[in-house]
From Swiss-Prot:
Organism (species): Sus scrofa
Biased composition (Polar residues): 210-220, 347-357
The protein's name: Myocardin
Residue stretches of each RPEL repeat: 18-43, 62-87, 106-131
Domain statement: The C-terminal region contains a general transcription activation domain. The N-terminal region, comprising a basic and a Gln-rich domain, confers transcriptional potency and specificity by mediating association with the MADS box of SRF. The basic domain may be required for nuclear localization. The SAP domain is important for transactivation and ternary complex formation.
Post-translational modification: Ubiquitinated; by STUB1/CHIP at the C-terminus, leading to its degradation by the proteasome. Phosphorylation by GSK3B is required for STUB1/CHIP-mediated ubiquitination. Phosphorylation negatively regulates the intrinsic myocardin transcriptional activity. Phosphorylated; by GSK3B.
Residues forming coiled coils: 515-550
Length: 933
């Protein structure tokens, strides 16, 4: 292809050359072309060019001459405004310039005459002035007419006389709440100038009011310009300006109102600082007298209140003198006055709050950077501080209020004074070591009405729990509160008195020390109370041991015959005292906590420490349900054996997983000794610095019960248990946070599988989780299909039934654990359960559910034996006696009145049959637990 291309190009080139040669040969010569006129002759002589140039210039000259001949005369041109008349040219511009200069001079003079004076500029924050000078001007209300002449001011600045106008305007008192006074709190002259401001009750709008000159001058002497620092040159300027006013009055014919509009770009006057009508000015001596009387009355009222009730030690001294103070006092061991005053604590005397808005200063958030500039200014304005400046300056002005607010809750919710036997970490960190405290805790609650029935006179709870549980779900120590008589009053005062946002303006160190000493006394008393209760519990244990020793040997329970791994009670049940034998009809027996321990908050949940009877080792598993509403009464919730049977599924974060023995194994316990298996159910929600619910995950180490009889392990001492509890209480933290955020607990598949393989089925009638509460007698008749009479030895043991019921229902015993029972699949579920009960005990046991109001949660309580799928077990969730109104109705240790009645409690929150353990997610029971948080 390249050869062909090159040959082709060579051919074309040769052809082009031949054609070009032919054209060059045939073309005409230059002369021929010139003769034919195609091109000009190249060699024309120079004379030809000169002649041509001359002809062109002649032609141009001819045209000019022709135009000059034909042009119009000057008159026509002037008429047509092409030319101006030479006579009018010079005088007109000169006159115009003179007129223009005169007009400019007039305008300038007018503006100078009407421009605002320096004091006016200072008042409107247009002119930057030293703070002391500004406050001197504002404190004395030194005012000038706005149109004073500046030139005269400069000329007469040395004059010394005060004109009548000047004395009148200088002496008119301004309102204490005016923007001039509210900015006084930060200047170095706050002390003396504050008194001057507070004694004046007029307003700056009434400068021109005609008051008697002699009275005004005497007032001026009383107000005393001595401490005002640098106002003296200002006074000189003021006098000269007022003297020059009379001379220059003719220069201000115009109304100055339109000129004010030009200032709107320089200055922002907030709405609450705009000029308002104020009462007529008062004589300053009379005003001082009135304010002294007012102060005296306020102090008298406060002293009377403090005589009758203890005042909260954290209140600031200056706040006792401020108006609009509303004390929500709690008449218990200490009280917190929640004062809401619109005054800044920098002023120690009253200012009549005429110009300041009536907003109450709420608590400041912990981080001032989050606030916008407008919000910062609003807070400053409420507190009577200057609102000008950059954002950092505004935040610096607000910092003292933020530090002194003493409010543990950062949001602007209502603050309710709550008397819990609780020691939250962020409120009272120095009381964590106390065994039981009745400490005050400001729960910031956005719900205004606490969910507490006023009918309960023995509650020591006066307020609502925090919506975002600040320190975990606070459970309360179950001890008779020493302030029962006052609790109802405090409850009513907190319900009716409303919640006031406090601004506690500082905690004095002395009063802090007093509070700490009071707290120590309270701690000692509660410790003594706890010791007494522990002694009572030990006596109770001995009584139970004696009864256990006298009991005849019983047949083993058929439905509790599966082997269950046993956890060391000493390691996992720190607060449990001596184990007790629990009668068969109640699978959850009392575990005595060391009387309400506020430093270790009790778990709110249903963690019934289940003690099996002498025949069975029962593995109990932690189940926490922090329900907050009091109508979910937990009493009567532990009456059926299903209540404490639950599958050990790791899907459920509330259950501690435990692997049980083979389903077919049976361990018959022939000794009357009972083994108590508790898994550290006192989840020590003690005060720790971390907020959020904390649950202990004791990581149970269960030893397979090789022998039929398990020895009774003595519980550890109280101090050891507390130490164990403190280490365990933080292990469920992350787990619960993840659970709440993601909605499910990350389950260990292997452990889950092993647990599910070992859980047998229970034959019986299947029931949905929302089944209504059936009659217990029918249920148990249905359950006892082929039964051995497991409870025949108890048929005449009515007193023992009652003792068990008392144990299981006593509020001190309900540190409530849910026990996990592994049930052999080859045995009937509840053989002879109803037969074994004496009539009275059975009635007392089961009728409580029918006496009480209906089920209170979507998942109704249920007593029927329920068959589950191949991997399920019936679950019973019982609520701790946390919300019931009678759980604090305890008697002194010698008596058992508080433990006597079963029918006083309400039904449990819910009993649920989980039909599938693998499906154990938050959709069924966990929602009910978490919806209250």
């Amino acid at each position: 292809m390249t050869l062909l291309g090159s040959e082709h190009s060579l051919l074309i080139r040769s052809k082009f050359r031949s054609v070009l040669q032919l054209r060059l040969q045939q073309r005409r010569t230059q002369e021929q072309l010139a003769n034919e006129g195609i091109i000009p002759p190249l060699r024309s002589p120079p004379a030809f060019h000169e002649q041509r140039r001359r002809l062109e210039s002649d032609k141009a000259a001819d045209t000019l001459k022709h135009k000059v001949r034909n042009r119009s005369d000057r008159g026509n041109v002037v008429k047509m405004h092409i030319l101006q008349a030479s006579s009018a040219e010079r005088p007109v511009p000169a006159a115009q310039m003179k007129l223009k200069r005169a007009r400019l001079a007039d305008d300038l003079n007018e503006k100078i005459a009407l421009r605002p004076g320096p004091l006016e500029l200072v008042e409107k924050n247009i002119l930057p002035v030293d703070c002391a000078v500004k406050e001197a001007i504002k404190g004395n209300q030194v005012s000038l007419s706005k149109s004073a002449d500046a030139f005269a001011f400069e000329e007469d600045s040395s004059s010394d006389g005060l004109s009548p106008d000047q004395t009148r305007s200088e002496d008119l008192p301004g309102s204490a709440g005016s923007p001039l006074d509210t900015k006084a709190a930060e200047t170095p002259l706050a002390g003396p100038r504050g008194t001057v401001q507070d004694l004046t009750l007029g307003s700056e709008n009434e400068r021109n009011d005609s008051a008697p000159q002699s009275g005004n001058q005497s007032d001026l002497g009383k107000q005393g310009l001595g401490p005002l620092g640098s106002p003296l040159p200002v006074h000189a300027a003021v006098k000269s300006k007022s003297l020059s006013d009379g001379k220059n009055r003719h220069k201000k014919p115009k109304d100055p109102k339109p000129k004010v509009k030009k200032l709107k770009y320089h200055q922002y006057i907030p709405p609450d600082q705009k000029a308002e009508k104020s009462p007529p000015p008062m004589d300053s001596a009379y005003a001082r007298l009135l304010q002294q009387q007012q102060l005296f009355l306020q102090l008298q009222i406060l002293s009377q209140q403090q005589q009758h009730r203890f005042s909260y030690p954290g209140i600031h001294q200056a706040q006792l003198k401020e108006p609009n103070e509303q004390m929500a006092r709690n008449p218990n061991s200490s009280s917190a006055p929640l004062s809401s005053t619109p005054l800044s604590p920098a002023k120690n005397s009253f200012s009549g709050q005429t110009g300041v808005s009536s907003l109450k200063p709420g608590p400041l958030p912990s981080n001032l950077d989050d606030l916008k500039v407008s919000e910062l200014r609003q807070q400053l304005r409420i507190r009577g501080l200057p609102v000008s400046g950059t954002k950092t300056a505004l935040m610096d002005r607000l910092r003292p209020f933020q530090d002194c607010s003493g409010n543990p809750v950062p949001n602007f919710g209502d603050i309710t004074t709550v008397t819990f036997p609780v020691t939250p970490s962020n409120a009272l960190p120095s009381y964590q070591s106390s065994p039981s405290t009745s400490a005050f805790y400001h729960f910031g609650s956005t719900s205004s009405s606490p969910p507490i029935s006023p009918a309960s006179s023995d509650l020591s709870v006066a307020g609502s729990l925090p919506d975002t549980f600040n320190d975990a779900s606070p459970s309360f120590g179950l001890h008779p509160s020493p302030v029962h008589a006052c609790a109802e009053e405090s409850l009513m005062s907190s319900l009716n008195g409303g919640s006031l946002p406090p601004e506690l303006d500082g905690l004095d160190s002395e009063k802090d020390k007093m509070l700490v000493e009071k707290q120590k006394v309270i701690n000692e008393l509660t410790w003594k109370l706890q010791q007494e209760q522990r002694q009572v519990e030990e006596l109770r244990m001995q009584l139970q041991k004696q009864k256990r020793g006298t009991c005849p040997e019983k047949k083993p329970l058929p439905f509790l015959a599966a082997p269950i791994k046993q956890e060391d009670a000493g390691s996992s049940c720190p607060f449990a005292p001596l184990p007790r034998a629990v009668k068969r009809q109640s699978n959850s027996s009392e575990e005595q906590p060391a009387a309400g321990d506020a430093a270790r908050l009790r778990p709110l949940g249903n963690t019934h420490c289940a003690e099996s009877s002498g025949q069975t080792n029962v593995l109990s598993s932690t189940f926490l349900s922090p329900q907050c509403s009091p109508q979910h009464s937990p009493f009567g919730a532990v009456k059926s054996p299903q209540h404490i049977s639950l599958p050990p599924s790791p899907n459920n974060p509330y259950f501690l997983p435990a692997s049980s023995g083979a389903p077919g194994e049976e361990h018959r316990v022939s000794s009357p000794v009972s083994s108590q298996v508790c898994t550290a159910q006192m989840v020590g929600l003690h005060s720790s610095d971390k907020a959020g619910p904390k649950f202990s995950n004791p990581s149970p180490t269960f030893s397979k019960s090789a022998s039929a009889v398990s020895e009774i392990t003595q519980p550890p001492s109280y101090e050891d248990a507390v130490k164990q509890q403190m280490t365990r209480s933080q292990q469920m933290d992350e787990l619960l946070d993840v659970l709440i955020e993601s909605g499910e607990m990350p389950a260990d598949a292997r452990e889950d599988h092993s647990c599910l393989q070992k859980v047998p089925k229970i034959p019986g009638s299947s029931r949905s989780p929302t089944a209504a509460l059936p009659k217990p007698s029918a249920t148990f008749d249905q359950a006892s299909s082929g039964g051995q009479l497991a409870f025949d030895h108890y048929s005449n043991d009515s007193d023992e039934h009652l003792e068990v019921l008392l144990n299981s229902q006593s509020p001190l015993g309900k540190v409530s654990e849910v026990a996990l029972l592994k049930i052999g699949s080859e045995e009937p579920a509840f053989d002879g359960m109803a037969d074994g009960f004496s009539g009275k005990a059975a009635e007392e046991l089961f009728n409580a559910h029918e006496i009480l109001p209906g089920p209170l949660s979507p998942m109704h309580t249920q007593f029927s034996p329920s068959s589950v799928d191949s991997s399920g077990l019936p679950l019973g969730f019982t609520e701790s006696p946390w919300e019931s109104m009678e759980w604090l109705d305890l008697t002194p240790p010698s008596s058992t009145q508080g433990f006597s009645s079963l029918s006083t409690g309400g039904p449990s929150i819910f009993n649920i049959d989980f039909l599938d353990v693998t499906d154990l997610n938050l959709n069924s029971p966990m929602d009910l637990h978490l919806q209250q948080w």
